[in-house]
């Protein structure tokens, strides 16, 4: 592994966080480039040459570049030496359940929820309405969809363990990445089961290190306090 090139571009958003957490779980050494979204850093000639999408995150392993966070997360956990403390599915059922969590988080909560809200929120509230326009109805519908998805998955949240059992998996990386951004957006999570799961998860050392790599702080509360 000493000759491997492992790099990640991305900072201060929940999508790069997914890759950072996977890297920490696999105990890998990597180099990170702390570039932000819509700061101009993703539009340089040098960056566009390796990622024509002009977005973050971007993951590199030697000559392989992956520009979607879910794909990069999956690559990291499946390609390198396995961790004894991270769950990788061996049965079709468990693979499908992890995929179900991942797709629900990526599509329903992230794309159709969080990102729609960000696109149409006012700039002073961290939104992009200067680009996409204000759309209160779209924000309301996106928030309703998030709440509906949380209500739907509540029955599958364990009382004590991780989503797939005694070890965390990619399902947890995806779900926690979404829960953290919901808290950043001040979307109330009413489910005691989900809140208890969140409180357990944030204590994991690999999660904390991924938070530091992504947000410079080990907890969301510290990050919010520093950025107020």
For the regions a protein language model found, what residue spans apply to each?
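GST-like domain detector, emphasizing the conserved glutathione-binding G-site
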Residues: 1-136, 228
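Domain-wide signal for the mature, well-folded portions of proteins, strongly enriched
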Residues: 7, 17-22, 31-34, 38, ...
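Short Asp/Glu-rich motifs
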Residues: 41-43, 201, 220-221
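GST-like fold's C-terminal all-alpha helical module
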Residues: 105-200
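Acidic/histidine-enriched, glycine/proline-rich intrinsically disordered or flexible terminal extensions
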Residues: 213-228
């Amino acid at each position: 592994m000493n000759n491997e090139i492992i790099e990640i571009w991305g900072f201060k958003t929940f999508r790069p966080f997914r890759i950072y957490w996977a890297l920490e779980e696999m105990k890998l050494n990597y180099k990170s480039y702390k570039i932000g979204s819509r700061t101009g850093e993703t539009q340089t000639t040098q960056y566009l040459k390796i990622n024509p999408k002009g977005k973050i995150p971007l993951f590199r392993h030697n000559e392989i570049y992956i520009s979607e966070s879910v794909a990069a997360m999956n690559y990291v956990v499946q390609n390198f030496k396995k961790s004894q403390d991270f769950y990788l599915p061996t049965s079709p059922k468990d693979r499908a359940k992890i995929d179900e969590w991942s797709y629900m988080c990526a599509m329903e909560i992230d794309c159709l929820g969080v990102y729609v809200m960000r696109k149409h929120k006012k700039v002073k509230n961290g939104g992009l309405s200067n680009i996409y326009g204000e759309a209160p109805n779209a924000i309301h519908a996106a928030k309703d969809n998030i709440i509906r998805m949380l209500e739907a998955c509540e029955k599958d949240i364990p009382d004590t363990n991780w989503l797939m059992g005694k070890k965390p998996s990619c399902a947890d990386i995806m779900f926690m990445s979404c829960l953290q951004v919901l808290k950043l957006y001040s979307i109330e999570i009413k489910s005691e089961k989900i809140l208890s799961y969140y409180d357990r998860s944030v204590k994991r050392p690999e999660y904390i290190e991924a938070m530091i790599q992504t947000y410079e702080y080990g907890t969301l509360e510290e990050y919010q306090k520093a950025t107020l």
